[in-house]
Every structure is written in structure tokens, then in C-alpha cells.
Curated annotation (Swiss-Prot):
Compositional bias of kind Polar residues: 139-154
Protein keywords: Antiviral defense
Presence of keyword RNA-binding: no
Organism: Escherichia coli (strain KTE188)
Free-text function comment from the UniProt entry: Sensor protein of a CBASS antivirus system. CBASS (cyclic oligonucleotide-based antiphage signaling system) provides immunity against bacteriophage. The CD-NTase protein synthesizes cyclic nucleotides in response to infection; these serve as specific second messenger signals. The signals activate a diverse range of effectors, leading to bacterial cell death and thus abortive phage infection. A type III CBASS system. Expression of this CBASS system (Cap18-Cap6-Cap7-CdnC-CapW-Cap17) in a susceptible E.coli (strain MG1655) confers resistance to bacteriophage P1.
Family (UniProt): Belongs to the HORMA family. HORMA1 subfamily.
The name this protein goes by in its record: CD-NTase-associated protein 7
Family annotation (InterPro entries): Bact_HORMA_1 (IPR041162)
Chain positions covered by the region annotation Disordered: 138-162
Subunit comment: Forms complexes with CdnC with 1:1 and 2:2 stoichimetry, and a 1:1:6 CdnC:Cap7:Cap6 complex.
Residues spanning the membrane: none
Amino acid sequence: MSYSSTETSTYTTIDVEAVMRRITADLVMIAASTGAITESKAREYAHDIELLAKNGYLDYVDVTLISNGVEQKATRFHVNESGELANDRPGDARWPRIQGAYLRIVVNNRSTYDQAARQKLSGKMKISWSPCSDDISHSGLTQSGGREYSSNGYGMQRKDYN
């Protein structure tokens, strides 16, 4: 006798929105604590990230605080559709305020984000995104903790670097 098992994970745009509320809270907290961008600008980034996520194009988002060419702190939000993540509360995203520092926000999209996808989202994005070839491996920082945000089968895992 043989048995089989099928496991599926489904989610809706409502689930993506629920997770994005937590990501937005983190981005706003990072913006407010560093002073590197305004809360309004953080919400514009969050809008675009959510748009990419809702359309299934987003792989991860990398946020880095840079001062004098040196990474000070970073966090990476990686999409996870396994349905196995916890649902933590946003927080622990207060970063230092360093004079002259700036935030680098990089989105990495899935291969499905092709020319047709760009056309589909044309005019809907709030940030003027451009290609980035920076090293975002955070080799000078140490991975330390993070958070998990999920709703049904959709989630994002946050990894922090100090």
C-alpha cells in the first residue's frame, strides 16, 4: 500500500498587505531613528515594495545605513512563501543617527520581473529605481537576529546585520 501527501500554501493580497504593514513599520522606524530619509519617503519605498510583492515579483529588500562609505547597520527582508514563519511584532529597528549617513535601499526581483512586468507597473511606482551593482553581502557586518512576519502562506524573514 502506498500513501501520498500534498501540501499547498495559499495566500491573498490581503496577506501580503498584512505582512507589508509590519515591513512599513520597520522602514518608518529606521527612517525616524536615523534621520537619513523622511517618514514620507520611507512610506513611498514601502508602497513600491508592496506593489512588487503583490504582483509576485519581489525576492528580497536590502536596507543599509552607510556613513563615510562604510556600512553601519543593515537589514534584509526576504520573501518566504513556505507558510512556516512566525508572526512577530515589528520592532527592534531603531538605528543610530549618524551625521551625513544615508540609506541604500535595494530591491531584488524574481526573474519574472521582465519587460512586460515593468510595463505593467509603469506609472504605479513612487520611487525612480535604478540598477545597483553595490556589494550588498554585508561582509563587514555580523548577522544578528531578526524577525519573521507572516500571514497564512505569505511571509518575510528579516535578518539584521550589525
